[in-house]
A protein has these predicted regions:
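Domain-level signal for soluble alpha/beta catalytic cores
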Residues: 1-314
Length: 314
């Protein structure tokens, strides 16, 4: 049951009928839960039960899309042999499947659960190596496709030029989501506006869903979505951070409890046409549980209220 393979069209039809809930953060939650600064992707090989435990917590919270623990599993971010990076990717997908199967066996649940092969933007100086990045993303996607992945999430991207070869390679083989990260003013680290990012993603026929994750908290993401138009023919995603981190004893931590505020803003975002909601850095299974209990997941024709951009104060 945990290894059900879905077609691209099956996933699209399901989400068009009823809004759906992603999981929350993996990296920040893993670091806090196990009090470690170790790259969480290493746990796929070194501590697989920890990985499955977090996946199960999100399933119990009500998530129907699990992202694999592979966000930074690439040769630029991980200082391990390339063959181990490949195994990290494979294990990431397998562990999520095992977690779903174990959860089904324990609970008797039969609802559809989608496992998204998670690929994050490769940061830093590597971003200047466009050809090398494109090859890396293609290699990562090939490994996931060999493992039978039917759902991809490219997230926290500031642009998508280097992604296009991989996206075109996947084509009709899997459901494709691309999520961008912008700041509170609606611009990515590449200097592109949220509007331009959605426009470019909207022009790629292979992409099924577009949206935003990370970068900002729920209030700023809501304000950004208010002044944007949903790309025609695309599903819309929103996965903000819990808020903004603070430096505590040398670590960037998300402090305080703002779950109620987070859920309230997410309710407003789904009313704007968001089809796929969830959380990024700082969110936990508790956030997702509250979302599952309070969001209206019915799907209906969307009419977006447009807010005027805020005027700059003198």
């Amino acid at each position: 049951m945990g290894n059900t393979k879905y077609t691209k069209e099956q996933i699209r039809e399901r989400i068009q009928q009823k809004k759906i809930l992603f999981d929350g953060a993996f990296g920040t939650y893993y670091g806090g839960k196990y009090d470690t600064r170790q790259l969480p992707e290493l746990a796929n090989l070194e501590a697989p039960e920890r990985v499955k435990e977090i996946h199960r917590e999100y399933l119990e919270a009500g998530a129907q899309i699990l992202r694999t623990n592979t966000f930074a599993a690439n040769s630029f971010c991980m200082d391990i042999p390339r063959e181990q990076i490949g195994e990290t990717l494979r294990r990431g997908l397998r562990l999520a499947r095992e977690a779903v199967a174990e959860w089904r066996e324990t609970t008797g649940e039969t609802k559809e659960i989608y496992i998204a092969a998670d690929i994050g933007q490769i940061p830093g100086e590597a971003m200047a190596q466009k050809d090398a990045l494109s090859r890396e993303y293609e290699e990562i996607c090939n490994i996931f496709l060999e493992e039978g992945a039917d759902f991809f999430v490219f997230e926290t991207f500031s642009e998508m030029e280097e992604l296009l070869p991989a996206i075109k390679m996947i084509g009709e083989q899997a459901f494709i989501t691309v999520q961008f990260s912008v700041n509170q003013f609606g611009y990515s680290n590449a200097g592109l506006s949220a509007r331009k990012l959605l426009q470019r993603a909207g022009e790629a026929k292979e992409i099924d869903a577009v949206g935003f994750n990370c970068g900002v908290g729920p209030s700023h993401m809501h304000r950004i979505l208010q002044i944007l138009e949903k790309p025609e023919g695309k599903l819309l995603t929103a996965l903000p951070n819990a808020g903004y981190p603070q430096m505590v004893t040398g670590r960037m931590l998300f402090t305080g409890d703002n779950k109620d505020y987070f859920v309230d803003r997410m309710q407003q975002m789904t009313a704007l046409g968001v089809d796929m909601a969830g959380g990024c850095c700082g969110t936990t299974p508790e956030y997702i549980s509250d979302l599952a209990g309070k969001l209206d997941f019915t799907q209906y024709p969307q009419t977006q209220e447009k807010a005027e951009p805020e005027k700059k104060r003198a």
